[in-house]
């Protein structure tokens, strides 16, 4: 499989000299990471992704090159290949003998700007002194990414694509060499408050998490439509920043909630939000590529709720419905919020009984009951 344009640009513009340690992200299935590991047999490569499904696909396609390539799905970049399971947002390498030799980030012009800013800062932090950062963008007219690089490095190289196939130029690659740690470390996570039936709750959000810095209108509609009873066990499918989980847990006595998400930052934010609201004993969360909760919890939930994204042509919505079916006990209720209820009414009718839809705040909440 050919890499997306921005990732292919980095592949074509890697340094000539061997790289000992490399940190990279991927927009597909780790093609850049796999090529680095293959080109330099003595290299150690970490491929970082914020999507558990992409992580699974990368491992399946690229393998591990005898342990030299590790694919990780954690909230932040690791400090080094030896610390690839313990990333932290503020970790800084300040010497020539630690950290990565190369960081390479493929990005898209339509990506989330705040996430790109944070990943650039983290990548700079993870480089050793003298290490090199490369970032590509699939927009030949880009200036925004160039400006961000000039905030980090005194000198930035620019390579504008000359498509070898003779087609339309694919984008730009920027490069910078770390000569000192950053003087200022900006934080991009945030806390925001919202009310549910008179209860003030606080949530935590980070770039890359759905609806960063605010409660999504669809999520608000779902919160208004759900009615967990005391003692219920609730599954929050695609928990994001955890606002639905927190509202459900605060609704009544003994309500427990488990959130699942494919983004490790979403899991982190949900757990941090639970701690902020003294709900850590009632709200848990786990990372998953298929929306399923842990095996020991399946078949135990009274209510499953979800706000699936629209960008996947209902693939993720289908995963949510399958997960709800596996997670609910007989008679348990599933709620899905959407602006386009027809697909849900048809698909949920194949799995659940008593399927119906109600309009809440210009959204539709589709309800079903497990047979």
Language-model segments: which ranges?
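Conserved beta-strand signature within the Rossmann-like core of class I S-adenosyl-L-methionine
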Residues: 130-138, 331-338
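A short glycine-rich, Lys/Arg-flanked "PGG" loop and its adjoining helix->strand segment in the class I
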Residues: 117-129, 320-330
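Class I S-adenosylmethionine-dependent transferase superfamily signal
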Residues: 36, 123-124, 248, 324, ...
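Intrinsically disordered, low-complexity terminal tails and inter-domain linkers enriched
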Residues: 64, 72-99, 324
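Class I S-adenosyl-L-methionine
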Residues: 152-196, 340-371
């Amino acid at each position: 499989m050919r890499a997306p344009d921005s990732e292919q640009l980095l592949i074509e513009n890697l340094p000539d000299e061997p790289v000992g340690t490399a940190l990279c992200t991927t927009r597909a299935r780790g093609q850049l990471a796999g090529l680095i590991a293959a080109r330099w047999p003595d290299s150690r490569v970490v491929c970082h992704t914020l999507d558990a499904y992409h992580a699974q696909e990368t491992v399946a396609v690229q393998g591990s090159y005898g342990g030299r390539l590790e694919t990780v799905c954690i909230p932040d970049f690791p400090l080094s290949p030896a610390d690839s399971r313990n990333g932290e947002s503020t970790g800084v390498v300040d010497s020539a003998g630690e950290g990565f030799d190369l960081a390479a980030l493929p990005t898209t012009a339509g990506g989330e700007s705040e996430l790109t800013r944070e990943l650039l800062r983290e990548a700079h932090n993870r480089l050793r002194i003298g290490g090199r950062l490369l970032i590509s963008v699939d927009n030949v007219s880009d200036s925004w990414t160039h400006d961000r690089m000039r905030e980090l490095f005194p000198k930035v190289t620019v390579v504008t694509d000359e498509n070898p196939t003779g087609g339309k130029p694919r984008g730009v690659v920027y490069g910078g060499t770390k000569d000192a740690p950053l003087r200022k470390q900006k934080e991009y996570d945030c806390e925001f408050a919202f009310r549910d039936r008179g209860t003030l709750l606080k949530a935590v959000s980070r770039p890359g998490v759905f609806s960063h810095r605010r409660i999504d209108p669809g999520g608000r509609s779902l919160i208004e439509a759900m009615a967990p009873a005391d003692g219920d066990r609730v599954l929050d499918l695609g928990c994001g920043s955890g606002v639905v989980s927190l509202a459900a847990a605060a609704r009544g006595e003994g309500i427990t909630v488990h959130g699942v998400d494919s983004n490790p930052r979403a899991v982190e934010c949900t757990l941090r939000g639970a701690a902020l609201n003294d709900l850590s004993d009632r709200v848990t969360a786990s990372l998953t590529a298929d929306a399923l909760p842990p095996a020991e919890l399946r078949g135990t939930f009274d209510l499953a709720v979800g706000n699936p994204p629209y960008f996947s042509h209902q693939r993720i919505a289908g995963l949510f419905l399958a997960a709800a079916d596996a997670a609910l006990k007989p008679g348990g209720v599933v709620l899905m919020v959407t602006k386009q209820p027809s697909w849900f009414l048809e698909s949920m009718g194949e799995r659940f009984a008593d399927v119906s839809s109600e309009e809440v705040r210009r959204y539709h909440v589709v309800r079903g009951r497990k047979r």
